[in-house]
C-alpha cells in the first residue's frame, strides 16, 4: 500500500447481518470528505459467507463509537452505492 493510499484510509466497522448476534467486521474505508468514506473489501471478503450492512464500494457516513474501550468509526448511513 502506498503512503498516499494509507494516509487516506481508515479502519471502518461494518455491521454483519444474519449472524444471530451483533457483529461488526473491520475493513478499510477510503476518506472522501469529512465523515464520508468508500468501503473497501477485506482480502477474504465473500458475499456468500458474510452479509455486510453496506457492501464494499458503498459510500457511507460514519460515526465515532466507543467499543471495548476504544474509539472506532462505524458505518451508519448509506450515502450512495458505487458498484
Question: Where are the predicted features?
Answer:
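Short, surface-exposed secondary-structure edge patches
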Residues: 49-53
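Extended boundary segments
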Residues: 2-23
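Short, structured beta-strand/loop micro-motifs enriched in basic residues and often containing a Trp
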Residues: 36-46
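Loop/turn positions that initiate beta-strands
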Residues: 57-60
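Short beta-strand-centered aromatic/proline hotspots
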Residues: 25-30
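Short, Lys/Arg- and Gly-enriched loop/turn segments at beta-strand edges
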Residues: 23, 65-79
Amino acid at each position: 500500500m502506498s503512503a498516499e493510499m494509507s494516509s487516506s484510509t481508515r479502519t471502518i466497522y461494518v455491521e454483519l447481518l444474519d449472524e444471530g448476534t451483533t457483529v461488526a467486521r473491520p475493513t478499510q474505508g477510503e476518506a472522501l470528505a469529512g465523515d464520508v468514506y468508500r468501503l473497501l473489501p477485506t482480502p477474504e471478503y465473500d458475499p456468500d459467507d458474510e452479509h455486510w450492512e453496506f457492501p464494499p464500494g458503498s459510500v457511507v457516513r460514519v460515526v465515532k463509537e466507543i467499543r471495548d474501550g476504544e474509539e472506532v468509526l462505524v458505518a451508519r448511513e448509506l450515502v450512495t452505492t458505487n458498484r
